[in-house]
């Protein structure tokens, strides 16, 4: 996923997601991703649920931390850049952590501090809309680690979901967290990631 964005692109795009976030799309991630995911979950056995209770905390002080299943392993995508990524042993179900830096936007520290979260999320939103890989892309808002986040939700043509959280933590850093995979896996991971993200490992 390309995350290098120019400041001009951010500023030009900022209005579109503001409009999007004020629409009824706010509820779509609950009604679309969650309902698809919950449908799959209703057929899961109790032994499978027990397995998901065994977790690990992964990440770094730079990128933040999340809780994921203990069986997941660290890996690096070819185009992953400096992301921290973990998967379930396949290239389908993946969690990604990163933090946006001023140099990625070609701006100064003071310009970075003045950015709005919606400017960054809008650029991601529009790039996904233009991609031929996705059949549906929409924006919403949610909470991750206690922070309000703009969320870019995507459904790939192969049925795989991609959920991207963009938010500003209390240390002034713009954070990037993404979760991709199939509904039966996301049903456990989505709330786990949203509830567990933290910028310091406890």
Regions found by a protein language model. Give the residues of each.
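Positively charged n-region of N-terminal signal peptides that target proteins for export
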Residues: 1-4
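C-terminal motif of bacterial Sec signal peptides marking the signal peptidase cleavage site
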Residues: 16-19
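Short, hydrophobic/aromatic-rich segments at coil-to-beta transitions
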Residues: 50-57, 80-83, 143-153
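Secretory pathway targeting signatures of secreted, lumenal, and periplasmic proteins
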Residues: 65-114
